[in-house]
């Protein structure tokens, strides 16, 4: 496994998923689901998934996610954009599933919370480029550890209301 290629592949989704929380600092936020409920009477995604968070995640995931490629070209800027968007769609899917399971916003749901974004990014990438199985396995192993550490940091920095 080429560690630089692996890092270049997971970095845009990590940045996109991790930076979306910065929207929580904004005074006005607009939920992606506009407060609407699904047919089961529960919110589609909840107040934690906002257009502002998606925008911040896509922009930072694309730009900051692309930076390692300036040293060693592995991905294009378009790849970083696609991986960032896919990661945030994976996070939205995870929120949708959690709402269907009657889990409130912020409730921990291992491994859904930790893997939804990275697995969606890998799935979408695999639709147009080769993603070695060992990269998917490695991402599935390291992501929960990194996710936990970054969530604790975001909690300490008061960017998140809970450390998970």
Curated annotation (Swiss-Prot):
The keyword S-adenosyl-L-methionine does not apply. It is found in: Cell membrane. Keywords: Cell membrane, Lipid biosynthesis, Lipid metabolism, Magnesium, Membrane, Phospholipid biosynthesis, Phospholipid metabolism, Transferase, Transmembrane, Transmembrane helix. Its EC number is 2.7.7.67. GO terms for biological process: glycerophospholipid biosynthetic process. Disulfide bonds: none annotated. It comes from the Archaea. Its cofactor is Mg(2+). It is a multi-pass membrane protein. Catalyzes the formation of CDP-2,3-bis-(O-geranylgeranyl)-sn-glycerol (CDP-archaeol) from 2,3-bis-(O-geranylgeranyl)-sn-glycerol 1-phosphate (DGGGP) and CTP. This reaction is the third ether-bond-formation step in the biosynthesis of archaeal membrane lipids. HAMAP family: CDP_archaeol_synth (MF_01117). Belongs to the CDP-archaeol synthase family. This is CDP-archaeol synthase. The lineage of its organism: Archaea, Thermoproteota, Thermoprotei, Thermoproteales, Thermoproteaceae.
């Amino acid at each position: 496994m080429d560690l630089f290629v692996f890092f270049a592949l997971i970095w845009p989704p990590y940045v996109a998923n991790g930076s979306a929380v910065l929207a929580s600092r904004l005074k006005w936020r607009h939920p992606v689901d506009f407060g609407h409920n699904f047919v089961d009477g529960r919110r589609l995604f909840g107040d934690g998934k906002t257009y502002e968070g998606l925008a911040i995640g896509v922009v930072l995931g694309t730009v900051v996610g692309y930076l390692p490629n300036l040293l060693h070209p592995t991905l294009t800027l378009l790849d970083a954009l696609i991986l960032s968007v896919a990661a945030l769609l994976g996070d939205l899917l995870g929120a949708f599933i959690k709402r269907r399971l009657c889990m409130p916003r912020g409730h921990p749901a291992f491994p859904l919370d930790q893997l939804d974004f990275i697995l969606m990014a890998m799935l979408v990438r695999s639709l147009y480029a080769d993603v070695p199985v060992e990269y998917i396995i490695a991402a599935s192993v390291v992501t929960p550890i990194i996710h936990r550490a970054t969530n604790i940091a975001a909690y300490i920095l008061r960017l998140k209301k809970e450390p998970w």
